[in-house]
Amino acid sequence: HITSKDYIADTLKLQQRFSRDLVLDFGGGIGTHALANAMSSKVEHVFFVDINETNRNFVEYRAKKLGVEKKLTFCKTIKDTQISKFDTIVCLDVLEHLADPASQINNFNEIMDSNSIALFNWYFYKGEENEYPFHVDDIKVVEKYCY
């Protein structure tokens, strides 16, 4: 992600503008966006959901170092958060790794209300020479997701 610094900066600015109240950070990796949201006065609490325990532990360590650990909860699944509706959902660079991204979007819809904000992106492309081998780019999956 070193080559992605401008992109990361842009997504941080975007979430700074729109994130508020109860935030779900889904698949947040090393936690840059979750930690930035935790530092925002507009955000009440961030629920960092990642299936990777190493990621969760690392972000928890970073949160403690930054003094924002009280504004974050770390969970393996959305259900573990015990929150029925989120005000903001952040899901960046995750959907292209899922076997059924359309189903995940439907799951997000269930935990949003009409005033919720969603910050999503995706990159359904394995690359010219398979540079992104873990990205889904099967045309049937992408068409189901996009249409």
Predicted feature residues:
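A conserved beta-strand element that flanks and buttresses the S-adenosyl-L-methionine
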Residues: V90
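Hydrophobic adenine-recognition pocket in adenosine-nucleotide-binding enzymes
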Residues: V94
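Short glycine-rich, flexible loops that bind phosphorylated cofactors or substrates
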Residues: H97-L98, G127
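A short, conserved alpha-helix within the catalytic core of class I
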Residues: L98-F108
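Conserved beta-strand signature within the Rossmann-like core of class I S-adenosyl-L-methionine
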Residues: N115-Y123
